[in-house]
Amino acid sequence: MFRTIARVLVPVGMVSVVLAPLASAQVSPSLPNPIAAPNPLTTTISIFRSNMQDKIRKAADAMPESKYEYRPTKDVRSFAEILDHVAAISYSLCSSAKGETPPATTTGKVSKTKIVADLKGAFEYCDGVYLGFPDAYLNAPADFWGVKTNKLFILTQVANHDALHYGNLVTYLRLNGVAPSGGWF
């Protein structure tokens, strides 16, 4: 029995090793190589964050404006409120990492266009923070709503928060018969 399993698994493993580079090259050839970047840690975090933010943008675009006030139950945020929340927290976390006061934002946007514009502004603000952030500064002290931590923690929380709420958005889309954009990248 062991030999039969080995006869199947060894060739499959060999093929996997040979094809893995080809498969990974097809995931997203446009991603920067963090190993070659001047700030590989910040670049790695930024790749994940950018991917999540792209997915959130696509979810915001995919949901019809008539469904922006949709909420699966009365005690959770609406689709629009999640997007507002993501924008506000992106501004808050990225400004904290940069050591600035968060830019003024408004909540309770009245249209899909305004909500998407604010979301785009928040993501662009974070882009500027990540692009100018050296790895050497990642262990600098930071405040996470009263918790003493470092800048690395703050920057990872931007991507973590986006991923958390992207999961909410996918559920809202599917409950409304809208297919989210697929894939890892």
Model region roles, listed by residue range:
Residues M1-R7:
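N-terminal secretory signal peptides that target proteins for export/translocation
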Residues L9-P21:
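Bacterial N-terminal signal peptides
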Residues A25-P34:
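Cleaved targeting-peptide boundary
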Residues V27, S46-R57, K67-T105, D143-F185:
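Short, contiguous alpha-helical
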Residues P32, S50-D54, G108, K112, ...:
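Carbohydrate-interacting regions of secretory-pathway proteins
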Residues A37-F48:
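N-terminal beta-strand motif that seeds the catalytic metal site of vicinal oxygen chelate
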Residues K55, A59-A60, C94, Y125-Y130:
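Well-ordered alpha-helical scaffold segments within catalytic/enzyme domains
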Residues V110-D143, T149-L164:
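Acidic/histidine-rich alpha-helical segments that form the ligand environment
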